[in-house]
């Protein structure tokens, strides 16, 4: 049974394991069945191919009916097949029996020793300890140095890895087990081919004395040409795959280019024909990894198939040279055919032929240069492994040279004792491919961590600077607030002083009832409380809106993070798909190699048949039966080729199906990527809309501030007008009072003078009439005069009292004027302060707007960075999960295969032991037969010609050689089985350790990921909170400033009105003595005006309460809708969020997160509806307020300018509604002051 194949072990990249089985099972030369098995076990070939033919040789059983060939089966080595075919072609029945029956090798031990010593010094560094026998085998003998060892050493001259093919007899019952154990990689197949070629040469040279047949290797050169075709197919597949990967990279764009894992320096982007040189040092490093025996051999040992990959530009000429070298390796030495019958010089002739006639191989390889270059490149890639290997190789070479110089009889069993621990140490080294993949993953994780840490540090520094600026702004605002409070306390103190002065007046408390003043104060307090409540409501609304927007931003950030994780996972999936495609291509290439090898075998067999026919013409009578057998063999080979082609077609179909599946997976991945990009665009749109809303609100606030400034300026102008009018009123009042006093005194004097004159006239008449009565009445008249004098005195006293009262009133007026001048000065100072503060606030608002824009840009950058970080983390998690799944599956498969192999090995060991015992018995029989035949030969020498004696001797020698070869094959099978066991155990241990390492690394990666996400979330939350706090504080400061301005305006107006009322009441009290009726009418008029004012205020308060209620309803509706939308979004987030061990990271394998609906569209519609509703309410309130103001201000001289432009926000509407009632009150008070004048 002959099999070539490759086996994949250890997961994604399998370490190859060579196994070659060459078994021929014959019961006898003429009648038993010969079975040949050629297969590729493992993943590449699903079943082997067997063919059998029957040989019917005539006359052979009569000669050897009682010999060893009567046994049911014969095990033939692969090296003896050439000799057996030559003997069959020539009709040499004794030669065939010589191959099938064991006998003495006929080769001197010293000659074999010399040939090995000639081979070893030339290539010390390429010695393979695995090909040497082990001391642990008790059946091994120092003289039984097999030809496989020689072939391994000869293969070193061809720059081929010295992994000798293991030869084992295969039983028909256990062909399935041999399929599993016969797996090997392409490189080992090439090694086996070169070993077969070199091993066939000495056996061909043995018969040079007899038949003068030229020695040439047929199978290897055909195999090499087929391997070149396979390598071409491999290159085409790899180029196609890399083109597909490049297209995918271009579609992904900058994301993949930014976060892709750098390829290994040993691998090239495309295996084009122009990128490879003609030197062996350009061979990729990955081709020599994971090959058993590479740990013991030198780093520069490269298989022939790999060397052919380095000559693509000169593919045809190099192939011709190589094929020519393999077809005619001894083209110049055909004259040097062996002519002597002795076998002592076989090895010398063989070495001469090999060393003198190899133009093709010397043409391709530069041994010294390539050796050093390859060793240096391997050290650059993996310095630790190379140094160990070189040391081990040097020690091995020294030991080999020492052992070869000793005697072969005494020291051969102890030659390799020192090599076993070294080989075990070298075999325990881990493969480079697994290490490099782990190193690249670890380095990528470290780079991502460092990038993220740097970004976080920069963000922390920026936020610390922003915090410092916010603290300074808060300090300035607090200082300004304290100044405002001090000013308000001073104003309240002046107001209280004015009220105490007014309370000291005499007739005020009697004229105006205290109840009305109390009600007026209560109404004012209620209005102030309502205004404060409105301000609190506005503040709460703004805070709720900001909080909701924070939550929305957090959700957007989470969605972006999930999208980035998904993108990374898709990138990793693409990489795994590419790896699987590469594996499939390798399988296809190996299958093509098998097909090409079968074609080569056919061609070689046909050539052998032609040569045999040429030689058989003189001996047709003896070889007619053998020609029939060869014809049957040819037919069976053709059938086998047909079966192999069928299997190749089936494997191709399977590979096509796999490719279709991979393309479908790639399309699914593309669709997922498109969906993710759409979701990212939607999130960006929502972010832009939120930013526009914030900017609109800021613009509205600036417009409101401008309106308030204009209103303040108008109020200042109105105050100045009122002050001018008050001064004119005071001057007029003073003149009127003075005129009234003078007129009253003049009138009183005139009336008194007229009365006295009338009385004097009457008395004078009476004196004239009654001169007599006057004297009697003188006393009465004197009394009357005294009474008149007392009256005059009383009138004079009254005049003095009135003059004193006027002086007091003048003093009071002077005091009032002084207070007015002081208040005017204070007003001017406060106005200046307000103007300066307004300017500062405007500048601060501009700076705050700039900072807000900067914060928004920084937030966008942070979100982008977070998206990038989450994408990386997602891709890493995906790779870890896929690697774990692959390792679990690989571990399970390996365990199952190891169990099967152990069982099959146990069974085979039993069978081999049985065969070994059987062969021992056979050897004993052969020795007995040999002794009997020697006696028969001595008797037959007299009668039989010398040629028969020679043929019998050769027959016996061949029989002994066959038995020895079968024994050695059994020993090698046992050794290979033990090695396979050890290798399987080591692979299981390595896989377990690798799984544990991966689990630990995954735990560490998840822990680092959680820490990074928590830090990022905390920082983002802190930054958002800080930005929101700054906005809230600025809004609160602006609201407080507006409230303070309003309070100042209202307090100033109230004080002015109270002063005017006090002055008017004093004037009324003075005028009341002379003009009671006029004063009564005036009081009634004032009362009516006051009642109208109270009604107007009540109506305005009712309207304000209505507006506040409407705003409260709107705010409640908004909060309810926002809570509903928030609950929906949370519900969808929880529904789509996958479950993992960590709470922060979602399951990346969940596909629902990619197809879920986007929620913020509904939010936008709700917000638009609420804004339209608020606009309608604002228009209604504006119309009502303008109508009321127009109705109340028709009779006034000065009208307050109405707000011409209204913003679309609810905050501006509330500010306008709060400001308008104060202007209405001022207008009504002005009307009250102007009506009496």
Swiss-Prot record:
InterPro entries found in the cross-reference section: C144A/B/C (IPR040118), CC144C-like_CC_dom (IPR039497), DUF3496 (IPR021885)
Record protein name field: Putative coiled-coil domain-containing protein 144C
UniProt biased composition (Polar residues): 129-150, 167-178, 403-417
Low complexity bias spans: 493-502
Record keyword tRNA-binding present: no
Positions in coiled-coil regions: 440-595, 636-939, 965-1042
Gene encoding the protein: CCDC144CP
Region Disordered, annotated ranges: 1-26, 120-181, 403-435, 480-519
Alphabetical keyword list: Coiled coil
Record-linked PANTHER family: COILED-COIL DOMAIN-CONTAINING PROTEIN 144A-RELATED
Family label: Belongs to the CCDC144 family.
Residue stretches of biased makeup (Basic and acidic residues): 1-11
Pfam families on file: CCDC144C, DUF3496
Record flagged with keyword Protein transport: no
